[in-house]
Regions:
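Core catalytic lobe of class I
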Residues: 2-154
Length: 154
């Protein structure tokens, strides 16, 4: 048994039901739909990924702070498809990490008679930072513009 504040909370079920009770996250790790039929509810291609992620990104954006980091896991084409929506909802791209799973990942998954392309042995994990924005007189200002505005105002 541990004492002190709880360091994590595990929710079992649909995360869309859990967001309303989320505290402001420091780090979000998303390992959702890839567009490869990986689980019940995943899309069958990159088509539909933006619609699948849109409500999640909206919740992340609403509850996060300017210091929140997002690690977005997916396939190369899946991430490239969702990236514009992340940007539109206030997330700034930082870097991409490519996970090379190696040859053992394809063992048993490749048939020499039917293979027509290189087997997929990578995933991407893309780091985003929540964009710092301040609303002033109906306009959204980044940190530099806001500091300049405050300096001129004072």
């Amino acid at each position: 048994m541990t004492s002190g504040p709880q360091s994590y909370l595990l929710h079992r079920g649909d995360v869309l039901d859990a967001y309303k009770e989320w505290p402001s996250p420091t780090c979000i790790i998303s390992d959702g739909a890839y567009g490869v039929r990986g689980f019940n509810g995943d899309t069958i291609s990159e088509d539909g990924l933006v619609e699948w992620y849109r409500p999640h990104i909206a919740e992340w954006s609403e509850r996060s702070s300017p210091g929140t980091s997002l690690w977005f896991w997916g396939t190369e084409v899946g991430w490239a498809t969702v990236h514009p929506e992340l940007k539109r909802q206030g997330w700034d791209y930082v870097q991409t990490v490519i996970w090379d799973k190696g040859l053992s990942h394809i063992a048993g998954n490749v048939n020499g008679k039917t293979i027509r392309q290189f087997p997929v042995v990578t995933e991407v994990c893309v780091l985003y930072q929540r964009r710092f924005e301040v609303l002033v007189d109906g306009s959204s200002l980044d940190a530099q513009a806001w500091l300049r505005h405050e300096w001129r105002r004072s």
